[in-house]
């Protein structure tokens, strides 16, 4: 709850009778351990591949990627001011399969072009999987594409498909 809301460990402990702040803090730290969420996301994707209903959501060869801004301290090295909220934030670039599994995420500097993060996520995923489970298409927004990025994507064997703004 503390990670998913704007409450801290003390606030969550106050909501649950019999739970101490130290227990909540320890649970939060265990979730923050290196690669813990990455491995959990991989297990979810594995489960989805075996589940017949998830196969109705898609074949798993397409994904989308976008950045989310997460509040951060101004003292964090890669924190920048989020232009929408006017607070310091760090970017989290996330790749999501068409079957809704999170296959890759990485922190990035806010307000930067995101095509390199988009390409890296697909390449990391494709390297870990066999040929039949690789991505063939990644949908991104305007910040996630450049001409160089589209060229590199083609050379790596997948399509980088931008949703371009103001096309009408």
Listing of model-derived features with the role each one plays in the protein:
Residues 34-92:
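Active-site-proximal, Lys/Arg-enriched surface segment
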Residues 83-126:
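Electropositive, glycine- and tryptophan-enriched low-complexity nucleic-acid-binding patches
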Residues 137-148, 166-168:
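Acidic, metal-coordinating catalytic cores used for nucleic-acid/nucleotide bond scission
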Residues 1-43:
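Short, positively charged, Gly/Tyr-enriched micro-motifs
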Residues 23-25, 36-37, 74-76, 146-154:
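A short acidic (Asp/Glu
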Residues 12, 63-68, 138-143:
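Short, conserved catalytic/metal-binding motifs centered on acidic residues
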Residues 16-18, 123-132, 148-163:
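Short, surface-exposed basic-aromatic patches at helix termini and helix-loop junctions that form
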């Amino acid at each position: 709850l503390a990670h998913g809301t704007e409450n801290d460990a003390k606030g969550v402990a106050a909501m649950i009778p019999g739970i101490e702040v130290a227990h909540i803090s320890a649970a939060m730290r265990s979730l923050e351990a290196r690669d813990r969420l990455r491995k959990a996301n991989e297990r979810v994707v594995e489960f989805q591949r075996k589940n017949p209903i998830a196969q109705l959501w898609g074949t798993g060869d397409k994904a989308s990627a976008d950045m989310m801004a997460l509040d951060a301290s101004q003292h964090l090295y890669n924190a920048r001011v989020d232009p929408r909220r006017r607070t310091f934030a760090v970017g989290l670039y996330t790749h999501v399969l068409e079957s809704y599994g999170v296959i890759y995420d990485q922190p990035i500097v806010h307000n930067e072009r995101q095509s390199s993060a988009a390409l890296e996520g697909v390449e990391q995923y494709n390297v870990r999987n066999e040929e039949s489970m690789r991505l063939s298409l990644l949908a991104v927004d305007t910040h996630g594409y450049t001409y160089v990025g589209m060229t590199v994507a083609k050379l790596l064997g997948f399509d980088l498909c931008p949703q371009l703004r103001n096309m009408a």
